[in-house]
């Protein structure tokens, strides 16, 4: 785990290279790229550069994933507005609009708004959230685990999920490995719980859902919470069931005092926790809770 640190006795150059590629560079671009693609989905290719610049500015200002999400939507709609404002340009100059006018003005307007309007309050909110979670960590570990686990399932990859995940990474950097154990457990439960429900309550899911449930086993095991989104979108009752199961799993990891120094990996990094079996038990119990709740609240499906 610490072999990328030159001060650690286990240091080796290959691990340091991997850390430089991933942690020092690739991971720092995640928010910027996310914002760029959000903007592009709204305004097509001219929105990508303004969105990416806005997302990078959010990262630099410690506004986190929430700042990046706002930057993406902001840049996208800024470019949409520019497209409407510049309809008067002669058709002979249309080629300039997507490669020069929209990106250039989009970057300028998005950058100014991010710098003077968005970044400061969003960064303050993220800092408040981090400090609040840290205060819970010193006062009541189990309560912190319940909250962090539940946050991972509320929006399954959205701002709250990413806020919890970002907090966990920050705690790992600070040498506190307990919070991220709850976070990763909570993030695995929604797809795993749904997968179990489709297996043991087959009559309450369509054939297509049962087939998708098999995929959820793998996505849950790999800590891909987003695998549960199609089920939640089709039936909102999935969300409270997932939140309860994730909160149970997160609370149990803190009750068992599990620590996890790895930022990602799902069940495949369980062996590096201080209590691998108790960690896996926490995840299984949380998934079972979600599955049972779904089995109770969902009605049988009539196959045509």
UniProtKB/Swiss-Prot annotation:
Membrane topology per record: Multi-pass membrane protein
Domain (PTS EIIC type-2) ranges: 1-304
Keywords from the named record: Cell membrane, Membrane, Phosphotransferase system, Sugar transport, Transmembrane, Transmembrane helix, Transport
Keyword Electron transport on entry: no
Subcellular location: Cell membrane
Membrane-spanning parts: 20-40, 62-82, 98-118, 140-160, 181-201, 214-234, 238-258, 277-297
An example molecular function term from Gene Ontology annotations: carbohydrate:proton symporter activity
Top-level taxon in the UniProt lineage: Bacteria
Cellular component, GO annotation: plasma membrane
Record function comment: The phosphoenolpyruvate-dependent sugar phosphotransferase system (PTS), a major carbohydrate active -transport system, catalyzes the phosphorylation of incoming sugar substrates concomitant with their translocation across the cell membrane. This system is involved in fructose transport.
Domains: entry comment: The EIIC domain forms the PTS system translocation channel and contains the specific substrate-binding site.
Protein name in UniProt: Fructose permease IIC component
Organism of provenance: Bacillus amyloliquefaciens (Bacillus velezensis)
Gene behind this protein: fruA
């Amino acid at each position: 785990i610490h072999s990328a640190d030159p001060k650690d006795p286990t240091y080796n150059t290959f691990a340091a290279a991997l850390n430089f590629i991933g942690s020092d560079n690739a991971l720092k671009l995640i928010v910027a790229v996310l914002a760029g693609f959000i903007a592009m989905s709204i305004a097509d290719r001219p929105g990508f550069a303004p969105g990416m610049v806005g997302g990078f500015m959010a990262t630099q200002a410690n506004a986190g994933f929430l700042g990046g999400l706002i930057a993406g939507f902001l840049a996208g709609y800024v470019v949409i507005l520019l497209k409407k404002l510049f309809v008067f340009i002669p058709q002979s100059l249309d080629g300039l609009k997507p490669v020069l006018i929209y990106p250039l003005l989009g970057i300028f307007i998005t950058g100014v708004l991010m710098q003077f309007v968005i970044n400061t309050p969003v960064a303050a909110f993220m800092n408040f959230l981090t400090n609040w979670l840290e205060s819970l960590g010193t006062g009541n570990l189990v309560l912190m685990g319940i909250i962090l686990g539940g946050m991972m399932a509320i929006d399954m990859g959205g701002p709250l999920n990413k806020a919890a995940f970002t907090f966990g990474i920050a705690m790992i950097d600070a040498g506190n490995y307990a919070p991220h154990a709850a976070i990763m457990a909570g993030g695995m439960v929604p797809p795993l719980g749904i997968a179990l429900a489709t297996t043991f309550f087959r009559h309450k899911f369509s054939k297509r859902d049962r087939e998708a449930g098999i995929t959820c086993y793998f996505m849950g095991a790999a800590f891909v919470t987003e695998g549960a989104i199609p089920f939640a979108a089709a039936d909102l009752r999935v969300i409270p069931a997932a939140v309860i199961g994730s909160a149970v799993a997160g609370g149990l990891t803190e009750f068992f005092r599990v620590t996890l120094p790895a930022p990602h990996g799902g069940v495949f990094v369980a062996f590096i926790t201080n209590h691998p079996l108790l960690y896996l038990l926490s995840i299984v119990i949380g998934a079972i809770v979600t599955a049972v709740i779904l089995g109770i609240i969902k009605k049988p499906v009539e196959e045509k």
